[in-house]
Amino acid sequence: MKKLKVMTVFGTRPEAIKMAPLVLELKKYPEIDSYVTVTAQHRQMLDQVLDAFHIKPDFDLNIMKERQTLAEITSNALVRLDELFKDIKPDIVLVHGDTTTTFAGSLAAFYHQIAVGHVEAGLRTGNKYSPFPEELNRQMTGAIADLHFAPTGQAKDNLLKENKKADSIFVTGNTAIDALNTTVRDGYSHPVLDQVGEDKMILLTAHRRENLGEPMENMFKAIRRIVGEFEDVQVVYPVHLNPVVREAAHKHFGDSDRVHLIEPLEVIDFHNFAAKSHFILTDSGGVQEEAPSLGKPVLVLRDTTERPEGVEAGTLKLAGTDEENIYQLAKQLLTDPDEYKKMSQASNPYGDGEASRRIVEELLFHYGYRKEQPDSFTGK
């Protein structure tokens, strides 16, 4: 029996963090020929993750250009992937989540009648402009995908409501938790953490396209109020490379000695910063999944989330982008021990560290290399 030719395609830092455990898992199985392709939609931040997990791509399309539009990213990725798929002819292409690379990769595969497996399938907000462009990217990828690897039961239900075939959906847990299990380390230290010392550290991430402009201004004003009121609080903000984000961050925090504006952290550093934080303010999707495993409350700086399981479990709260609301919720976590304890002890509904194994074993079952289907993630 010939080997199963599997190609993983990704292009951004968040994708790379979640695909890295799967890439490493695929290499363990003699039945599989694994190819790694990166579009490098985010060049520098992607390379940090590849280096951290010791992954060398087989194909690097290197499409990154400064301030390129969504249309340019899509068209560049589509043309380059079209050429690659024509040459390599994989049996299945695995894409992740909701980036422009995800959509372009699935569309290019469809044009060649190559099967598509969608990792982290079924997340939905129901608003095609929130998050933008991610919500529609994942819906369109879902329309193309042949196999849907849903992280949770809720994600599976979303797909069933869209009339996806039940036997094409597999609940695996989220590969983000697989990654976390290998990166958080006892005795971790960093010069920035030394500067924070014994103060309470709030870890901030803010970069989403739909939050640029007034929403981000409101977030930053709320954070200024928090550090102005609480002398034992410091904020660490690894600032995204987007020039618009960097300009706003330096405008609001450039003169603050208790808001540390630092370069984007490598994945191992970021996970360990999160583990040592008091709580997290974020508009990132991945952080919403990772923090529950670390016992850290999360205030989500968005009006919607495609990860309602965390809200239901109690570890996430939607803070939105209103200055007063963000301020009040952050203040509550700093002054109400019971509320902090309640949020920090919530269970993680997103994974158990076995998602990558389940995905690979499901592929082998689907293509006839294994007789038994793997277990599903139950979230318990």
Curated annotation (Swiss-Prot):
Q: Where in the cell is it found?
A: Cytoplasm
- Which catalysed reactions does the entry list for this protein? UDP-N-acetyl-alpha-D-glucosamine = UDP-N-acetyl-alpha-D-mannosamine
UniProt key word Disulfide bond: no
A GO cellular component annotated for this chain's UniProt record is:
cytoplasm
User: Pfam families of this UniProt entry?
Assistant: Epimerase_2
What result follows from mutating residue 374 to L? Answer: In TS-21; temperature-sensitive, develops, at the nonpermissive temperature (47 degrees Celsius), a coccoid-like morphology, i.e. a phenotype associated with a deficient synthesis of poly(glycerol phosphate) teichoic acid
Biological processes annotated in GO: cell wall organization; teichoic acid biosynthetic process
Read off the lineage from the record: Bacteria, Bacillati, Bacillota, Bacilli, Bacillales
Q: What does this protein do?
A: Catalyzes the conversion of UDP-N-acetylglucosamine into UDP-N-acetylmannosamine, a precursor of the teichoic acid linkage unit.
Family to which the UniProt record says this protein belongs? Belongs to the UDP-N-acetylglucosamine 2-epimerase family.
**Name recorded for this polypeptide:** UDP-N-acetylglucosamine 2-epimerase
Q: Which NCBIfam families match?
A: wecB
Q: What is its EC number?
A: 5.1.3.14
Print the keywords alphabetically. Answer: Cell wall biogenesis/degradation, Cytoplasm, Isomerase, Teichoic acid biosynthesis
Question: InterPro entries under this entry?
Answer: UDP_GlcNAc_Epimerase_2_dom, WecB-like
Molecular-function GO terms, alphabetical: UDP-N-acetylglucosamine 2-epimerase activity
SUPFAM superfamilies, alphabetically? UDP-Glycosyltransferase/glycogen phosphorylase (SSF53756)
Name the top EC class: isomerase
Q: Does the keyword Ribosomal protein apply?
A: no
Q: In which pathway does it act?
A: Cell wall biogenesis; poly(glycerol phosphate) teichoic acid biosynthesis
